[in-house]
Curated annotation (Swiss-Prot):
Keyword Phosphoprotein: yes
Region (Disordered): 608-628
Lineage, top ranks: Bacteria, Pseudomonadati, Pseudomonadota, Betaproteobacteria, Burkholderiales
Name of the protein in its database record: Chaperone protein DnaK
CDD domains linked to this entry: ASKHA_NBD_HSP70_DnaK-like
Protein family: Belongs to the heat shock protein 70 family.
Species in which this protein is naturally found: Polynucleobacter necessarius subsp. necessarius (strain STIR1)
UniProt entry tagged with the keyword Phosphoprotein: yes
Amino acid sequence: MGKIIGIDLGTTNSCVSVVENNAPKVVENAEGARTTPSIIAYVEDGEVLVGAPAKRQSVTNPKNTIYAVKRLMGRKFTDPEVQKDIGLMPYAIIQADNGDAWVEARDKKMAPQQVSAEILRKMKKTAEDYLGEEVTEAVITVPAYFNDSQRQATKDAGRIAGLDVKRIINEPTAAALAFGLDKQDKVDRKIAVYDLGGGTFDVSIIEIANVDGEKQFEVLSTNGDTFLGGEDFDQRIIDWIIAEFKKEQGVDLSKDVLALQRLKDAAEKAKIELSSAQQTEINLPYVTADAGGPKHLNLKLTRAKLESLVEELINRTAGPCLTAIKDAGVSVANIDDVILVGGQTRMPAVQDKVKEIFGKEPRKDVNPDEAVAVGAAIQGSVLSGDRKDVLLLDVTPLSLGIETLGGVMTKMIPKNTTIPTKHSQVYSTAEDNQPAVTIKCFQGEREMAAANKLLGEFNLEGIAPAQRGMPQIEVTFDIDANGILHVTAKDKNTGKENKITIKANSGLTEEEIQRMVKDAEANAAEDKKALELVTARNTADALAHSTKKALEEHGASLEATEKEAIEAALKDLDEAIKGSDKEAIDTKTEALGKASQKLGEKVMAAEQAKAGAAPGGAAPGTASDADVVDADFKEVDDKK
């Protein structure tokens, strides 16, 4: 059985970890970095760039460079959060046929799952390069406050990337695993995980207990906001830069897509710098131009100003924290440790707010960028059977229920219920001889069903004719360990289990997933072909170069026919290298190798003659006595 890797699929950055010899290790990507920007670029020649290469070209290709796509996962186009992003993103967010939010690049319409799959493929490849074996299974993390649609979308992204997603786990829970596993003390402790990432905010209260030699991680409560993160902090800085520049220069940069991409990069850099400095300079020469010529941007941003710009965002994290504490049935005094997760928690003002909420300094011994991936890898080792001393008890973040008379949300499974869990409820008909019932399933905390997230409509058909209220229809809600809902129904009067039809109101159909899997496989095959072509070209190029050099130095000692044959083979190979036919390049490389065999022999003979040429010379690698210098040495004691 191969390794089950752990992947933190982040809004801004992603990370992959594996467990080796019982210890988790974060794997560096091909660029040598431990985290990979969650950025995907679709370039003109059809190539797809992922991570740092995509980020580097984003300024010149903003409309086809997709970032923060996690914010669109499992969302409808009409969602207020999506509508807000449409005005901010340089790329096109469009409405799919099923009403979902999709993106468009190079005239191709794509689901967020497809785009996320490109990041997952890079994470998969990173792990494979390190392990030296194929990876097919993974544990992928999601924000604790992700709903059913968003979790299902993440699983689908994994499938498109060629991964069997063994488990979806919540990011704060994964961070708690990373934090608590190496703690040797036997004392039970309650921890709060404050996770402010690139696009989402989560808080979980978790109890770590030692039960019969086993570490038990039990989530007591969770809360959050799936549309609050570092990207929003960046946007506040961008809005401020645009307003300041308009005041100074009278030019509105918000209409300039190329300028906006530069502003985004500058805002992110300024925010990071202000975590350690009190002031930073935002300097963008030639940011735009008008009739009067080019315009340059030069602004000073202080830490105090930044804090005033984002104060409202930081304050928004307090509500979910207080709710989570209340739902967990604990007081702030009961919480032993506060752990910070997510890059945005490096901001001093965020750390001050955490201290204010929980009444204690947050711990700094957890890497906020890597802890989630490490925890996912640990859970992977538990699922593969490599670790048997860890038990994870997670919860469902939002209540599940159905719409009943008057449009009321009747909760069947309340939020913060430990999963997996199952709940059954008996329903009946509202009219005589009613042949079918439609059960609308919702997820959320609002009293009226319509204000919550509609997960789907469950139709039960073929009910035997009877008076209203007589048929007994048992509906069972079953949440698996991934936090994903499954529904079954049974007509209790007949004892038959009737198959329920789930009319998913969003998400990808099985056909769409299969098509995207095939597309991804085709891309992988294309990538392999491209790599093979580059390798063949490099081999051919190296042979052509060395042959030309040898011909210049030793060509005079060849027969005229031999020299002509080599020159003809060189010409053929040069032509083949310009093309894209790998077979032709390989054939011509082989032909040149054969044609230049005699030349190779001449070169070898010349080298050997040169090596033995110097009479009375010292043998290679030895020195004559004349070169040796006698020296006295004295030992020096550094400690004096």
